[in-house]
């Protein structure tokens, strides 16, 4: 069998969820959208269900997958519904629903429902993606109550720059939210992963840890609470070929690496079809046989090359770690000019093995 695998440590996942609770004293929705950021939504939900206050996903399809797997905990639809016909399913499966636009509010008012909805009313506090304008927020809240179709309303917003610890934008968003919710008697939810780790002043009865659940930092700089996270995924494979090259020889497509010295090259069963970033440059760190080395040459669809010159013990069959507990996903992402969210979500072909059940 091809040796490319993703090892998922469910005990680390639980540790990170508990950390979100510990840091905030709030209830926490585990964000497992996009197949739990490439970690497997159903398995992650089953691992957390005994202690999680609920889960959050992007859409009804993701929520119904959880329900089909027997997950009975609350599930919030972060994008809400896309057409009014979904409201019956939302009510039938006891899903919680974000309302971020006036058209959604109007759909709730007009659609007959056999049971009331749990609604999270989203404010656009400055990100300008989705969310109600502050001038419409009070009226939308009152209309939801008057509709008789909601059992509870939670007030929420989403931070645009909470991963920038010195940015004023997050404080400004908090101020906009606080002004908009004046006089509204409801729980609130503001803090995503960077909000949980770095913005203790942000109010939140509910928090929404996403990236931090999987043990990756949302920050580009060192941060004390993020240092307590435990990586959940280890992306690994094995060396499948070794060759010795003299100085001056090219490696891989486009000859993007030319050996500056006699070089021992290992080829590994991992490529961009597995989700490893094609744009990762020469020098991107990897771990082989327990020792750090680096990527050389362009990443191919199914294979890539690494420098084994200073790892003489490495040979065919030696284990390779691309990210995990020793090479952090955030470090690889930074080399590749992207973010850990993306490299996790891109893992489509690699089989997952679970430990820490």
UniProtKB/Swiss-Prot annotation:
Spell out the Gene3D superfamilies in the cross-references: Alanine racemase, Lyase, Ornithine Decarboxylase, Chain A, domain 1
The EC category is: isomerase
InterPro entries the record matches: Ala_racemase, Ala_racemase/Decarboxylase_C, Ala_racemase_C, Ala_racemase_N, Ala_racemase_pyridoxalP-BS, PLP-binding_barrel
For biological process, the GO terms are: D-alanine biosynthetic process
**Quick one: signal sequence residues?**
none
The Swiss-Prot or TrEMBL record annotates one GO molecular function as: alanine racemase activity
The EC designation for this entry is 5.1.1.1
**Which family is annotated?**
Belongs to the alanine racemase family.
Do you know which PANTHER family this protein is assigned to?
ALANINE RACEMASE (PTHR30511), ALANINE RACEMASE, CATABOLIC-RELATED (PTHR30511:SF0)
| Name of the protein described by the UniProt record | Alanine racemase, catabolic
Protein's organism = Pseudomonas putida (strain ATCC 47054 / DSM 6125 / CFBP 8728 / NCIMB 11950 / KT2440)
